[in-house]
A protein has these predicted regions:
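Conserved donor-binding/catalytic core segment of Leloir-type glycosyltransferases
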Residues: 731-748, 757, 768
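Nucleotide-activated donor-binding/catalytic signature segment of Leloir-type glycosyltransferases, i.e.
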Residues: 775-799, 807
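Short hydrophobic beta-strand element within catalytic cores of glycosyltransferases
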Residues: 808-809, 828-829, 833-836
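A charged, aromatic-enriched C-terminal amphipathic alpha-helix characteristic of glycosyltransferases
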Residues: 873-900
Length: 908
């Protein structure tokens, strides 16, 4: 591809390599889209269709004329966008090769107009430079491919849906413009039929069904794009309809950019529709705001690379499109998508220099019921802490049209199936029944919607008639938002008891759900989870279901069940794998998905940043060192994605030596940046909180004080009694053994404490020190039994050392920069008193378990002289009493509550 054809599409990221997040400017987005299509089509041609000579078979399926038509159509859009060569050949030449070999007799409807409109780009039929080199037979074949006039009889006989009038109108209008149609009355008649169809509903929403059952879906919006070439003939109705389509998708847009997430033909096509609507919005000047529509198109475009491999769509791999778009139409779907994106790029070219708002700005709170007509047909649209979600109440009885919540990546259902999810399923005889079709009524209030049906119906059809219920009764569903979750209550009252009744909730492997069921009295129920990973029938448009949560009731006519579903919080931590982070997260269990760091030079590039709900920052210096510009880029990206940040402020500045060797003060700007950005900051003491705020500012964050947890879960099982530890360490007996453990710190005055021991007159004291700096030596004194440089040891060794001690010493400089030390929590867990300096952290954390001894050698010597057994016993009892305060289970529960609150705060 030439440099003029393909421009850098944007920064490379882990979520869509090598394309990255698309550019925000509409002009650059147009180039990005066109480049993406050119790259994909080139790859497809090079691998499977050199020179435009399509194969006759693709992965076991015959290649039909629809592929020829769609490839020519896509190339026509690229040509209009300025692409003259592709895969080393002129676009004109490839299109000519395709049309010369097309099977005209088997090309019809959608593919007829695509051939005709493509040919029209080169001018009228006579003297058309594209067709001139073809022989008479080939030209006749192309003319036949453009002609679907015989289908008009099927439309007259109502064998085809009424909206096929638009398809045939495009066919005949293009033929008339080519000069292949003599009687314009045919076009006029078809255009009038199109107007009749579009004007049928005063709300401008298309019911795409044959029987008028209220099948509102992706085509409810798409029909207005499809009829754009007819807009001049349709009149003002068309622009009103486009405005309605845009208003609908402004409400139904999913977090992944899918325009309409229920019904048929969504998934990859749902993303493409959003891009198309963004282009149409700019071209025609309708929609809420141009910059917001560019942002919507950009959001959808960012996911497009994930729908393709080697130029071919992945919509059939590990997921499924609708049945009529099965693997036998894989190439056609591929080119259908490319054609839509190429068209959108051309439209965006006309409206330059509109810059998208940040993606997070699209995430404004929403709670709205969109009515499709004067019946109860509607869709409930919500956007909040649980993401964007829709619940449709429409016609058709296949799985995709039932009133299950849809939020791609979180709430998905099987494609084109009789597997009904989130709704009651009752079996009578061999037939299953559920709530299908438009409800009798739908009521909406703040944060909730209620729907009622007159019973349950059997069958799972795309276009069946809506007859009386097979199981009469009254069935009500009540949906309401609850934080990040969704609560659904079902009241079922049937005239006849089925032999079985159940509910099913599918779950993706990468998006665990916390599911709770409850039944109100009799009958009793049974909950279960079933692994279905790899079972084809459980595939959705976007993924495959990993497991199904199911709840069955004993046979009954009447039932009331409550369903509570909350997506597991996806947490990325800058300390992933560190023992502090492990100790914090493990007690949270299934409430979180624990993900590695996803930002900065140390990031795990396999982590999808768009699949993160919250970022937990620990030590900023280990995210991007002292590179302030990189820290700023990370902060901006978090903000653009709307990912909140919780920061545990372990320090005021990094420990020395810092990761880069720079002095700790060099990181002040980095710490201030994160203090301004963070949504919550965790401190381990109130005094630490006050010092942090005084130095770095409060920002807009919640400042919360939570204790430092102890690490006893890592070493408790290795503890032994004191005498055993004494023997294993080769220590002589002592009445009072004081330990110094933990890594050296500038503020940790180990030498002063040891000098104090050497200066005191007590003979019953023994000190064991494993905390010296490498360049530090201890006084020569027989009471200092061990004086070793710090080395990280395993859990068993650490437990052995604690077991040998009667107290731990904490000789920290009260005026230093440290905010906390985890060894204090270990002292509490081990039931050991702390011999403490005047450092404020020690007194607040240890309480009565702290024995003041100062930090200078003279202070330590004097304090040791005064220390008696009663003091130590009282401090030991106080340490044991404080264990509940430092248990990670409690710290984790309080931290998890903070996580949830921070996510909710984003939507306050």
């Amino acid at each position: 591809m030439s440099d003029t054809t393909r421009r850098n599409p944007g920064p490379t990221g882990p979520d869509a390599p090598p394309w990255g997040w698309p550019p925000a400017d509409s002009s650059d987005l147009a180039v990005w889209l066109r480049s993406f299509v050119v790259d994909g089509v080139e790859t497809l041609l090079d691998r499977h269709a050199p020179g435009g000579r399509l194969p006759r078979v693709f992965a076991g399926h015959a290649v039909e004329p629809d592929v020829t038509a769609d490839l020519a159509y896509t190339l026509g859009h690229l040509r209009r966008g300025g692409v003259e060569q592709i895969a080393g050949a002129p676009v004109d030449e490839i299109v000519r090769t395709l049309l010369a070999g097309i099977d005209g007799d088997r090309t019809h409807t959608f593919f007829s107009y695509r051939v005709a409109e493509t040919v029209l780009q080169w001018g009228p039929w006579d003297d058309n430079p594209l067709l001139d080199p073809l022989d008479d037979h080939e030209r006749s074949n192309v003319a036949t491919a453009c002609d679907s006039s015989e289908w008009i009889e099927l439309l007259d006989a109502r064998i085809l849906p009424r909206n096929y009038a638009a398809v045939l109108a495009r066919c005949e209008l293009a033929r008339m413009r080519l000069g292949l149609l003599g009687d314009p009355a045919v076009v006029d008649d078809l255009l009038q039929r199109v107007v009749d169809v579009l004007a049928d509903n005063p709300l401008h929403h298309l019911d795409d069904s044959v029987h008028g059952v209220g099948r509102y879906d992706i085509y409810t919006a798409d029909v207005w794009l499809f009829t754009e070439p007819l807009a001049d003939h349709i009149g003002p109705l068309w622009l009103d309809g486009l405005r309605t389509a845009l208003e609908l998708v402004e409400r139904t847009l999913a977090d992944d950019g899918t325009a309409v997430a229920w019904g048929r033909s969504t998934g990859s096509l749902g993303a493409a529709l959003t891009v198309e609507l963004a282009a149409a919005s700019l071209r025609h000047g309708v929609g809420d705001a141009p910059d917001r529509w560019v942002a919507r198109g950009r959001r959808a475009a960012a996911r497009l690379p994930g729908w393709f491999t080697d130029g071919v769509t992945d919509a059939h791999r590990h997921r499924s499109p609708y049945g009529y778009r099965g693997p036998f139409r894989r190439l056609q779907l591929t080119l259908d998508l490319y054609g839509k994106l190429a068209w959108a790029a051309n439209e965006l070219d006309r409206h330059r220099d509109t810059v998208a708002v940040q993606d997070a700005e699209l995430n404004t709170p929403l709670d709205e019921l969109v009515r499709f007509d004067d019946t109860a047909a509607s869709v409930w649209c919500t956007r909040g802490p649980g993401g964007s979600n829709v619940v449709p109440f429409v016609g058709a009885t296949r799985s995709d049209y039932l009133c299950a919540p849809r939020s791609p990546g979180t709430y998905e259902v099987p494609v084109d199936s009789e597997l009904a999810c989130w709704v009651p399923v009752a079996v009578v005889g061999e037939h299953r029944h559920t709530v299908t079709g438009v409800p009798v009524r739908v009521d909406h209030g703040p944060g909730w919607v209620t729907a009622e049906w007159d019973g349950l119906r059997s069958g799972a059809e795309l276009d069946g008639e809506h007859g009386p219920p097979d199981l009469p009764g009254t069935v009500r569903g009540h949906w309401r938002t609850a934080g990040r979750g969704l609560h659904v209550d079902w009241d079922v009252d049937l005239d006849e008891a089925p032999r079985a009744m159940w509910w099913s909730v599918p779950e993706r492997a990468d998006r665990p759900l916390q599911v709770q069921w409850r039944t109100d009295g009799a009958p009793t129920g049974r909950a279960d989870t079933v692994l279905v990973d790899g079972v084809d029938e459980w595939r959705s448009f976007w993924s495959r279901t990993h497991r199904v949560h199911q709840f069955e009731l004993d046979p009954t006519r009447r039932a009331r069940i409550e369903l509570r579903v909350t997506p597991t919080l996806r947490l990325s931590s800058s300390a992933h794998g560190h023992h502090y982070h492990r100790s914090l997260v493990e007690p949270m269990g299934d409430a979180v998905v624990d993900l590695p760091l996803a930002w900065g030079p140390l990031a795990d590039t396999a982590v999808d940043r768009d699949a993160i709900d919250l970022f937990h920052l620990h030590w900023p210096e280990w995210v991007a060192f002292d590179d302030l510009a990189e820290h700023r880029r990370i902060v901006e990206d978090l903000g653009a994605r709307g990912v909140p940040t919780v920061w545990t402020a372990h320090n005021l500045t990094p420990h020395a030596p810092t990761p880069t060797g720079a002095p700790p003060e060099a990181f002040d700007a980095v710490y201030r940046l994160w203090a301004e950005h963070a949504d919550a900051v965790i401190h381990h003491t109130h005094a630490g909180r006050d010092r942090f705020v005084a130095r770095h500012g409060a920002g807009h964050a919640r400042h919360v004080v939570l204790p430092h947890g102890d690490f006893s879960t890592l070493w408790a099982e290795h503890r032994v009694d004191r005498s055993t530890a004494e023997q294993r360490l080769g220590l002589s007996p002592a009445d009072l053994r004081i330990g110094l453990v933990g890594a050296p710190r500038t503020e940790k005055l180990v030498g002063e404490f040891l000098e104090g021991v050497a200066a005191c007159g007590r003979a019953d004291v023994q000190v064991v020190c494993w905390s010296l700096r490498d360049d530090e030596t201890a006084p020569t004194d027989p009471r200092i039994a061990i004086a070793e440089p710090y080395r990280e040891v395993d859990e068993a060794t650490y437990a052995l050392r604690l077991s040998a001690c009667d107290a731990l010493a904490f000789p920290f400089d009260p005026d230093g920069g440290m905010q906390a030390t985890g060894t204090v929590a270990d002292a509490i867990a081990a039931g050991l008193p702390g011999l403490c300096s005047d450092w404020w952290f020690l007194g607040e954390s240890l309480g009565e378990a702290a024995v003041p001894v100062g930090h200078a050698a003279t202070q330590v010597a004097a304090a040791l002289e005064r220390l008696d057994g009663d003091q130590l016993a009282a401090a030991r009892s106080a340490a044991i009493a404080r264990r509940e305060h430092t248990r990670w289970s409690d710290v984790a529960a309080r931290t998890l509550a903070l996580y949830e609150q921070v996510v909710l705060d984003r939507w306050a």
